[in-house]
Curated annotation (Swiss-Prot):
Source organism: Schizosaccharomyces pombe (strain 972 / ATCC 24843)
Alphabetical keyword list: Meiosis, Membrane, Transmembrane, Transmembrane helix
Residues of the signal peptide: none
Gene: mug110
Subcellular location, record wording: Membrane
Topology class, membrane: Single-pass membrane protein
Any one annotated GO CC term: cell division site
Role description: Has a role in meiosis.
One of the GO biological process terms: meiotic cell cycle
Annotated protein name in UniProt: Meiotically up-regulated gene 110 protein
Transmembrane segments: 23-43
Length: 248
């Protein structure tokens, strides 16, 4: 009886140890396999995002794949420059009258096409339901004109409203402007020539004292790099011209 009880205890202990081993194996298998796949995903996404900045954490914790994100992203400066593919309303008599009024009042603000819809009763679906009345566009332009007169002077073309290509607004082209400084002095340099608005360029260019370089000074010392002198009048030709003027 004693031997049988000892054998039973050994068998039960052996079975319990085997059960513990199986439980440990199942536990570590269920833990390590997901960790292994997560590590593979992290390595793959890290390899895909090495050429892009600040996207490692986003690629790891985001549910969307990197390829789908790259397909959804659009380079606004890589789109082809084509005609705007926008559906315009029917060009009715009321629309023509509204455009004529807007053109006469001078409130177009650099807009190429004034979008207004026809009056009620002419048929068709209202393409602009946000406008309450057909004259809402004119009222909006009048309000812009009031703000422009009484508010601060803002160059609307300088913030990109003037260049509209389809469904996006592009940044404006830079326009050169000069500082009120004589360009032919020795102090003039590349810092003299800035980028600004055209009205500043016109106003400042009137105050510039443009003069020819002296015959004794070299061209490189008298002119800044942006200018190219094609021909410099010689001293003899200048004296000859002055003598002819005195004789006449």
């Amino acid at each position: 009886m004693v031997e049988s009880s000892d054998e039973n205890d050994q068998a039960s202990s052996f079975a319990s140890t085997e059960d513990l081993k199986e439980l440990r194996f199942v536990f570590w298998f269920s833990v390590l396999i997901p960790i292994f796949f997560i590590a593979l995903i992290i390595i793959k996404r890290y390899h895909s995002c090495t050429y892009q900045k600040n996207r490692l954490l986003r690629s790891i914790f985001c549910c969307m794949s990197i390829d789908d994100e790259e397909e959804l992203e659009t380079d606004m400066y890589d789109l082809p420059i084509v005609e705007p593919s926008i559906t315009l309303p029917k060009y009715s008599a009321s629309l023509q009258e509204n455009e004529r009024l807007v053109g006469i009042e001078g409130e177009r603000e650099g807009i190429d096409v004034v979008l207004n819809f026809s009056k009620a009763g002419e048929g068709g679906v209202n393409p602009y339901p946000s406008f309450d009345t057909p004259n809402a566009r004119i009222l909006q332009l009048r309000q812009l004109a009031k703000l422009k007169k009484h508010g601060p002077r803002i160059s609307y073309h300088g913030i990109g409203i003037g260049r509209c290509n389809g469904n996006r607004v592009l940044p404006p082209y830079p326009e050169p402007a000069l500082l009120p400084e004589a360009p032919n002095t020795r102090e003039a340099s590349n810092n003299t020539y800035l980028y600004g608005f055209s009205n500043n360029f016109i106003n400042i260019s009137r105050t510039l004292n443009l003069r020819y370089p002296s015959a004794s000074a070299s061209i490189s010392d008298s002119l800044p790099p942006p200018y190219q002198v094609l021909s410099v009048p010689s001293v003899t030709s200048t004296h000859a011209f002055s003598n002819n003027a005195n004789q006449t």
